[in-house]
Design a protein with these regions (language model features):
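Long, compositionally biased interface segments
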Residues: 106-174
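OB-fold ssDNA-binding interfaces and closely related basic DNA-contact patches used
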Residues: 1-87, 139-141, 146, 151-157
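Short acidic, glycine/tyrosine-flanked loop/strand segments centered on an H-E-D-like triad
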Residues: 79-115
Length: 174
């Protein structure tokens, strides 16, 4: 299952959803161990922060600060979820085992090349739609659901394209 935590809309993870990526932000989130903090990040650091230089790896591979909290590198993908009857904004956070998926998605977007008047160019991320599904992963004796992302193709609906562009503009200016 996929859950939009804002609208509480549930989506079938096997069927997936069509998403249009509008903006990406890498951040470092400071967390207290489960059950000891506020169950939300204690601090959030920008991608140009030197916070990782202030950590040491613990026995489980987490980057620990002197206060005992750990830093989790998180890719924040701001998207539009497109269905037959609606278009809604959403945030997809990818960290830990999903970091590789996040980096792969960014590479997939950056590898798109179109021919323009001045030669080849990389279009904005919101020019293409992707199918986001969930798949069962396993490793080190554990199982979890993760994301699978497949490019569907160019956004052909001009109204949706303009909405995605507007969402991008609102986020990129921050």
């Amino acid at each position: 299952m996929l859950l939009n935590t804002v609208t509480k809309q549930l989506y079938d993870g096997a069927k997936g959803v069509t998403v249009i990526p509008c903006h990406y932000k890498l951040e470092y989130q400071e967390w207290a161990d489960f059950g000891t903090g506020s169950n939300r990040p204690e601090n959030i650091y920008a991608d140009d922060s030197d916070i990782l230089s202030k950590t040491t790896k613990d026995s489980s591979g987490k980057d620990r600060l002197d206060n005992g909290h750990y830093i989790q590198t998180t890719g924040q993908h701001y998207v539009l979820i497109v269905s037959d009857d609606s278009v809604e904004q959403a945030l997809i956070s990818m960290s830990s085992s999903q970091g590789k998926i996040s980096r792969g998605w960014n590479s997939m977007m950056m590898s798109i090349s179109l021919d323009g008047k001045k030669g080849p160019y990389t279009p904005p991320s919101f020019s293409h739609a992707y199918k986001l599904t969930t798949v069962l992963n396993s490793g080190k004796g554990n199982q979890w659901y993760g994301y699978k992302i497949v490019k569907e193709g160019p956004v052909t609906d001009s109204a949706i394209y303009e909405r995605a562009k507007k969402f991008y503009t609102s986020l990129a200016s921050k």
